[in-house]
Swiss-Prot record:
Classification via InterPro entries: A-D-PHexomutase_a/b/a-I, A-D-PHexomutase_a/b/a-I/II/III, A-D-PHexomutase_a/b/a-II, A-D-PHexomutase_a/b/a-III, A-D-PHexomutase_C, A-D-PHexomutase_C_sf, Alpha-D-phosphohexomutase_SF, GlmM_bact
First-level EC class: isomerase
Listed EC numbers: 5.4.2.10
Keyword terms, alphabetized: Isomerase, Magnesium, Metal-binding, Phosphoprotein
Source organism of the structure: Sinorhizobium medicae (strain WSM419)
Active site positions, chain numbering: 102
Protein name: Phosphoglucosamine mutase
PTM statement from Swiss-Prot or TrEMBL: Activated by phosphorylation.
An example Gene Ontology CC term for this record: cytosol
Reactions catalysed according to its record: alpha-D-glucosamine 1-phosphate = D-glucosamine 6-phosphate
Gene symbol of the encoding locus: glmM
Protein's job: Catalyzes the conversion of glucosamine-6-phosphate to glucosamine-1-phosphate.
Swiss-Prot/TrEMBL GO biological process terms: carbohydrate metabolic process; peptidoglycan biosynthetic process; UDP-N-acetylglucosamine biosynthetic process
Gene Ontology molecular function terms on file: magnesium ion binding; phosphoglucosamine mutase activity; phosphomannomutase activity
Length: 451
């Protein structure tokens, strides 16, 4: 089924432009409320958001939709995405909602949905929601006496802070560590510095002054330069860069170098395997993860289970294969012993635990393998299907033959933007760059002809 509303991570788009309009947000509330309105009990939904300006608008629109469908709404305010997943379970809600466009700029926003178990919704349920969104839902509205109520929940962020702190081993404190943290002017601007301070660290926060339009603006995990500068400036032991909704993390070592999600997964997998905590004999990661990670794990008799791009697919693979570590190169790290979705703060705490226990620097701890040269370029498209063109297919086949067993090629449409992503990796950087440039040129020519 071709998706009209949902991408790889919920519904996303520019605020006040379809599909991210208050009208559709209200209809999503009605549709989702209708699907999860099962049984005679009073149904409830929790709604969290990040700090972008349009969050107020979409939050109120969704409240209207859910209450019209007869559900009670608990409003959490700004809180990390993993906090919404946790509180959906804790508050015995039927559905959880996070209003966020993650690492995107403030102009964008999105709607992420969680089931009562705290996991993101399956493709099947999303398809049911899509079907309802295109129907007249008047008959689905609650009777006047059954309309829902809405209330703001106080203290919810402190419950999440306690949950995050409990993931640090009890024999470890952060005393003696100077930690610079960039909260991207986003959802974790209160919780992350507080959690680190309560665990004993000296905390140097940046990106903690949201104003509605500065979320992810030259800060956070997609713009690590600000944190790199701060790490040098204050001589921090480590830098932690979160994104707008704090479900992803990158680390900056004491030398100012960026440590990506692949290296972080290697650290956690190694540490947990040594402690007998790693389940399933491996980890799950997407097709974007570096070949170097796969080779590193193979050398330790651990398996890398590759999935489609999107942390929800990583989680599905983890549940299917009994794994408890998974993630993405971009910094989504899922640790199912502690939660149901990516959690930047919790992942960072696991790295800090290894640093404290081994007494080594972050650069010594986190540089586990030499990444295979990887080149990623995007081709913007506005119409047509360039990947179905015969010339493009032949160019892809030729590229795969050139890489053979010494590399990988991945070409896919973005699930959140009008882009085709072209990625290749291999031991010969020159060859990889040439292959990517040739494919970008071929796809671009087909795009231009279609336009």
């Amino acid at each position: 089924m071709k998706r009209k509303y949902f991408g790889t991570d919920g519904i996303r788009g520019q605020s006040n432009i379809f599909p991210m309009t208050p009208d559709l947000a209200m209809r999503v509330g009605i549709a989702v409320g209708t699907i999860f309105r099962n049984g005679a009990h009073r149904h409830r939904v929790v709604i969290g958001k990040d700090t972008r300006l349009s969050g107020y608008m979409l939050e109120n629109a969704m409240v209207a939709g859910f209450t019209a469908a007869g559900l009670d709404v608990f409003l959490l305010g700004p809180i990390p995405t993993p906090g919404v997943a946790m509180l959906t379970r804790s508050l015995r809600a039927d559905i959880g909602v996070m209003i966020s466009a993650s690492h995107n700029a403030f102009r964008d926003n999105g709607i992420k949905l969680f089931g009562p178990d705290g996991y993101k919704l399956s493709d099947d349920i999303e398809e049911k929601i899509e079907e309802l969104l295109d129907q007249d839902m008047t008959r689905q509205l609650a009777k006047p006496e059954d309309i829902g109520r809405a209330k703001r929940v106080d203290g919810d962020i402190y419950r999440y802070i306690e949950q995050a702190k409990r993931t640090l081993p009890r024999d470890v404190t952060l005393t003696g560590l100077r930690i610079a943290i960039d909260c991207a002017n986003g959802a974790a601007y209160k919780v992350a510095p507080s959690a680190l301070w309560e665990l004993g660290a000296e905390v140097v926060p940046i990106g903690t002054e949201p104003n509605g339009v500065n979320i992810n603006l030259e800060c956070g995990s997609t713009h690590p330069a600000a944190l790199q500068k701060k790490v040098h400036e204050v001589r921090a032991d480590i830098g932690i860069a979160l994104d707008g909704d704090a479900d992803r993390v990158l680390i900056i070592d004491e030398e100012g170098q960026v440590i990506d999600g692949d290296q972080l997964m290697a650290v956690i997998a190694d540490s947990w395997a040594a402690d007998g905590m790693l389940k399933g004999g491996g980890i799950a990661a997407t097709v974007m993860s570096n070949l170097g990670l796969e080779r590193y794990l193979q050398a330790r008799r651990l398996k890398l289970h590759r999935t489609k791009v999107g942390d929800r697919y990583v989680v599905e693979q983890m549940r299917q294969d009994g794994l408890n570590v998974g993630g993405e190169q971009s910094g989504h790290i899922v640790l199912s012993d502690f939660g149901t979705t990516g959690d930047g703060l919790v992942a960072a705490l696991q790295i800090l635990a290894v640093v404290k226990r081994q007494g080594k620097t972050v650069s010594e701890i986190c540089r586990r393998f030499e990444p295979v040269p990887q080149v990623l370029k995007n081709v913007r498209i506005s119409a047509g299907k360039p990947l179905e063109d015969a010339g493009v297919k032949q160019a892809i086949a030729d590229a795969e033959a050139q890489l053979a067993k010494n590399g990988r090629l991945l070409i896919r449409p973005s699930g959140t933007e009008p882009l085709i992503r072209v990625m290749a990796e291999g031991d010969d950087r020159g060859k990889v760059e040439r292959i990517v440039d040739e494919l970008v040129s071929v796809i671009g020519a087909v795009r231009n002809a279609a336009a």
